[in-house]
Amino acid sequence: MQIFVSLTSWDGLSELTLFSDFSGFMDRFYVGIENYKEILTSKEFYQVIGNTLEFVILYIPLMLIVSMIVALILNSHVKGVGIFRVLYYIPVITSWVAGALIWKWVLSPEYGAINNILALFGIEGPSWLQSSKWAMPAIVLASVWKDMGYFGLMLMSGLQGINQEYYDAAAIDGAGKIKQFTRITLPLLTPTLFFVLIISLINSFQLFTQIMIMTPDGGPLGSTMVMVERIYKCGFRYYEMGTAAAYSWILFAILLLLTMVQMKLQNKWVNYDD
């Protein structure tokens, strides 16, 4: 498909994929908006949207909390932070293939490390990746592990941009660490948090590699089938290029809408004052 597109004058809005029923090597036929009607009236689409939103809702808050903790540790001067600064970025530079295989082993119900630790406390761990209830939370856990160093580094740069004089003045006024964090750190860090929120939202909708390795074929009962995996399967497994392209445009529209909403709402909570 990509070779075919590269040999055409394709502007992304032509009938080649957007309004075509194209199967790769056969003649294409104009079908209008039938691809979109088929998608929007199918049960699979709403399951895919639901799974994707479940990941987003679980992933983004947890990722922000963990990344903030990482950033605060990196920005501190406690003993041993030098070792942490070396180790925290290892998941980021580890390929998703290797990382997903590691997590597949860690989450194994027979010999996985997590269930073995739970067994020490008399808790019977679930079959993480074989359960429709726990498969998506397991994917979220692995994704946070992979991304916390990347977003933690961004937040650390934001922390280092805050003038130390604010903290000194607050300390003189008797403000404790918690009040300094809520009244100084968080408000002045909102521009960085806003950027991280947009990037992480787009990143979460592009969920693919860890899904394909940890829970192939959509996971148990299709519980981890997400948008990008559906696009891949429609295009390169079923050779329904028109349907795959329609899914891609729907994904683009969703991301564009969510980004516009975030840009519109930023004035209500993002503080750009120095």
Question: What are the residue ranges of the model-derived segments?
Answer:
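A structural signal for multi-pass alpha-helical bundles of membrane permease subunits
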Residues: 1-274
